[in-house]
Amino acid sequence: MTMTSNWTPFLVGASLHVLSEEKTKDVNNLLRFISEKGITFLNITPSHFSLLSSAREFLADADIPLPESMRVMLGGEVISTKDLNQWLKFYPGHRFINEYGPTEATVASTYFRIPVNADNQVDLPVVPIGKPVYNTQIYILNRFREHCMPGVPGELYIGGMGVSRGYHNKPEKNAEAFVPNPFNPADPSDRLYRTGDVVRMLDTGDLEFLGREDHQINLRGYRIEAGEIESALREHESVTEAVVVPRKDTAGNLT
């Protein structure tokens, strides 16, 4: 349940279907529910969509019609293009949106419309998290809270109307997570939210998510983004999910 999925339907005169966790666990039944209700917009996590896409592949011979122009909004996790392309085999008119945003910034901070090529396939090596939505500002900053050049990884800070007032009765946590905007010192009420997410700006102006700052591994003096390795592993046809975990050898050194 998110702000975007809860309120958007009412802005366009659509109906909202909210299912219990039990009903969404059975992806075969979920797939048929989407078909029976003629769902035109689906908001779902990438891991849940992966199960849904696999279920459709398993039921390849079944007739499960869906609206031709259905839109699928994914968010909260890294997206597998394999799942998207598997789905497009059955529903070539469907299109996907990658939505990014933490709860502290009212969930929706950036979005990316995922393009398809001439063969109606997604051929991106990694799906970006896109550009900021209206009334939202994004900053990629280094540890000195200075701007990072395009292509250089840094921590993502979010500003704008969607930034919350903070955590209830947690002043220490608020001071760490919500910081004064160093680029607008004239307004002391203007704050940025530190996401802890490491991103970089692509040549297109879109943001690419690289991982969590607290998931960086320092190995023999090199800072390694575990998320980048995980993303590369997931692109292999024999890999469904991947997690990179540092280990220590007998001497206690990371390997």
Where are these regions (language model features)?
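Glycine-/small-residue-rich active-site loops that bind phosphorylated ligands and cofactors
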Residues: K23-D26, I79, T250
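Short hydrophobic/charged patches on amphipathic alpha-helices used for structural packing
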Residues: N28-L31, D61, E230-S231
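Conserved AMP-binding
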Residues: M1, E22, T103, G160
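Conserved AMP-binding/adenylation subdomain of ANL enzymes
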Residues: T2-T40
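AMP-dependent adenylate-forming
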Residues: T45, S50, T81, K89-N98, ...
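Structural motif
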Residues: E21-E22, T45-S47, G76
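Gly/Ser/Thr-rich phosphate-binding loop
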Residues: W7, L11-L16, I39-N43, S53-L124, ...
